[in-house]
């Protein structure tokens, strides 16, 4: 039994417990999570420290229910989210230190290479441009200006350029820095003597290649821009390569002297577009391989992640790290399904998937059963309509995590006991009816990825 199933059964039993007031359930218990430390140790995580105190008297009840569900003796601890996150970060830090030691021993290759960059329609032109210039620095497209929103892979490409040039042109000296780093150095040096300012310029100009990531951080800094302008001209005049990245195209940059904007456009300016779904999916699969996740991840689960995170490569990698952690905590699970994924990422606002609401759930379910949305909300008692209504209620609880009272109101003003009965009935049917389970899985996938 996976953690998602355990949590579902636990919440159903607790809401039916007459000793637990509905307001206590809705305020503190509804949002709890359960995680597995190892085969015999589980941890129940409450949203806040206050919530942890509020459910103190119900801890024995929660422990007993979990043991009943698992049908085995286990150790159960309780904590709250902030504290649990601290514990996770501490564990990750220890694991990272261990990984760093192993990496050094194995002389692990830098991950920011052209070979490790996932190419798709959204970034192909930028990739070709950076790779081409890296193979012939200072010859053409000088400067090379890459622009696009944060998290699209600009930093990866610029670091790949640095690594490639250093590996293939041992006689060339390469300097890589962020725009913020350059600005801080310039501001510091401007407090010093003219001689020291000139020395700083000369030190930067000793390089054969200059790469500045997020050059927009130099905007609205007049004195810094004067230093930058001098350095820029030195590189161009001496056929030394310049690489820049920014969140905007040169024409849209504010806070720069016009002569700098003109020079940004002297070479080649090229955009990295938002990731398309195909590229995001490829990045997820590559990251799963890179993180050596042995548990199989279904295509539906991967599509779910790409729908959430196609706007940011860093978030994609972070989401796969979350999968990796879950996989390590649940070694007995052989497959990561969309049900597990949707539960694992339930803390992420559903707005990231577009308009995900009760209306959408009703529409998808009613379409499947060939009935109207009004029929789901109405009083009709035919078998197909009742089944569709119960499934829609069940999915509303599963996906949106609405309260029983909310769901009752959203489905024709029914009371919360009707919702409990509907949810329990579907839960029981899913355990016995494989075809129904398949249907519900398909509906859930369609709702989440449509």
Swiss-Prot record:
SUPFAM superfamilies from the xrefs?
P-loop containing nucleoside triphosphate hydrolases, TrpR-like
Q: Name one Pfam family in it.
A: Bac_DnaA_C
Map out region (Domain IV, binds dsDNA) in residue numbers: 328-450
Q: List the induction conditions.
A: Transcription is constitutive; transcription is reduced by treatent with DNA damaging agents methylmethane sulfonate (MMS) and mitomycin C (MC). Protein levels remain constant during treatment with MMS, MC and chloramphenicol (at protein level).
The cysteines joined by S-S bonds are none
- Annotated signal sequence range: none
Question: SMART domains recorded for this chain?
Answer: AAA, Bac_DnaA_C
**Residues the entry annotates as binding ATP:** 151, 153-155
Region annotation (Domain I, interacts with DnaA modulators) maps to 1-76
Q: Where is the region Domain III, AAA+ region?
A: 108-327
| Chief site of localization | cytoplasm
An example of a Gene Ontology cellular component annotation for this protein is: plasma membrane
Keywords, sorted A to Z: ATP-binding, Cell membrane, Cytoplasm, DNA replication, DNA-binding, Lipid-binding, Membrane, Nucleotide-binding
State any further remark: Estimated to be present at 2000-3000 molecules per cell.
Note what the entry says on domains.
Domain I is involved in oligomerization and binding regulators, domain II is flexibile and of varying length in different bacteria, domain III forms the AAA+ region, while domain IV binds dsDNA.
Annotated PANTHER family: CHROMOSOMAL REPLICATION INITIATOR PROTEIN DNAA
The name this protein goes by in its record: Chromosomal replication initiator protein DnaA
Organism the protein comes from: Mycoplasma capricolum subsp. capricolum (strain California kid / ATCC 27343 / NCTC 10154)
